[in-house]
Amino acid sequence: MSNGTVRNEAIAPNAQRLLWAGFLAILAAGIGFGIRGGILANWAAEFGFTGAQLGAIGGAGFTGFCFGIIIGGVVVDKIGYGKLVVAAFLFHVLSAFITFAATGGQSQNTAYLFLYIGTFVFALANGTLEAVANPLVSTLFPHNRTHYLNILHASWPAGLVLGGLVGWILGEGMQVGWKIQLGLFLVPTVLYGVAFFGQSFPKSEASAKGLSVGQMLQEVGILGALVACLLVGLFFKEQLGGILGFFTGNPFFASAAWGYLAWAVALGLLVVVGIKTNFSVGSLLLFVLFLTHALVGAVELGTDGWIQNITGNILTPAQGKILFVFTSLLMFSLRFCADFIEKRLNISPIGLLFICSMLGFIGLRMVSGIETFAGAMIALAVYAVGKTFFWPTMLAVVGDRFPRTGAIAMSIMGGIGMMSAGLLGGPGLGYAKDRFTAEHLMTTSPAIYETYKAPVPSRFLFLDEVTGLDGTKLSAAQTAPARTPDQQTVADASIIGDRETLKADSYIPLVMAVVYALLFLYFKSIGGYKTVRIDAPVQAVTAR
């Protein structure tokens, strides 16, 4: 392998068409995500969900993505990009039908089932599309991956902007129902289907060299697979066990036996990877990048799922939507500047990630203390700049340094980030909100807490159970035109819970900053950050 020079040309004549088709695909995901973030309050008011239940539904929007992107990443070089695009299109349409089946008057369990599964299938479609788009753009533009992957992922905040505007104009302004709002994500779904239709696709560098799946997995190895398998085991134990227990009432799904079964599944997957790679340990650097991307998913996407709800609670729902649109628009604009930052300012991808982590930490601390709309705009601008380059730049680093992995390492990394957001970020923030709010209200007004507490306790990993506030009662207190003293106390406690949640969340990018600083020193010790290329055909070997 050798270090490649930096150029900007693409390797296929239809590269720009494919780039913008991928842009539209991720745009559809962003619009759906942005609208869902704005209708959480509608779901809480209509069905009485707690913060933890809303967090679990939001979490399904990440875990489904993980399965789509990892499975898609493993098979994409074998079955081709086109078949995965068709599958994603069908999943997107199916998700709308399932989600819309949740209606008022149903039992809470039934509505929860439809919303959870609908969100999961929506995310499955998003993950399948990203299993196409990320390696496709990385292959099309091998000499400037950071720039073009950031352009590709500019569609995510663009989708959030459009989704936020839908909530602001149709939801807050025109009082349009949440189903009509959510159904608008089908418009870009049709557009990306048309854009991809009839196109030819290039092979990844690793696939063109004739590498097998086992060979592509060797740099991932046992270490990299361990990160993904731990999250898969956690999904089976916590989320799948939780939803099966919720609907069946069978205590088995909350028992130690179910936990052992979940971890056995994870171990089995790890053994399969070991067999495919001849039990290669894998790259330590890639292992560190996978772990760090788990933090990226938790802090960026996990926070995105809650930030509109939280800022809308601290200020007003309308202001929360405006702020969400503002930060997303800022991210959209900045992602077109990655080439300028990297080439003109001479900041390496790792240096950029370090700077963003520090801004993310500072921004979240500032957001936790906002009192006014103007102050919120400044604080969220700092946070938005910080989170702008995390996801696409991490993907670019993997594409630059590990070309032998083809689409697999990039897809596993995306899956790890989304799985972390779904299992740790979204539910963790929901649990934190329930916990901090309940603790404050129990301390200051225990009688009011007893009146407003939820019927079902919230759990998160190994932490103690906590009983948050009933979503319907909290929503009534927050939206009352003239609050009673008790309602004001509950609303104030909820705001305090939101502030403490953001403070706790801020420590994640601080840890990331330490990791990126160490990686920066590592690359400096080996002569600087450089793109690695596969120069010669690789001899085929048997992967047992």
What are these regions (language model features)?
Residues 152-266:
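Helix-loop-helix hairpin linking two adjacent transmembrane segments in secondary transporters
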Residues 144-167, 171, 411-433:
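Glycine-rich segments within core transmembrane alpha-helices of 12-TM secondary carriers
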Residues 242-251, 425-506, 539-544:
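Low-complexity, proline/glycine-enriched hydrophobic segments characteristic of transmembrane helices
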Residues 90-108, 358-371:
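C-terminal ends and interior cores of transmembrane alpha-helices
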Residues 36-40, 221-258, 274-325, 422-433:
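Extracytoplasmic gate region of multi-pass secondary transporters
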Residues 59-74, 325-338, 505:
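Central cavity-lining transmembrane alpha-helices of secondary-active solute carriers
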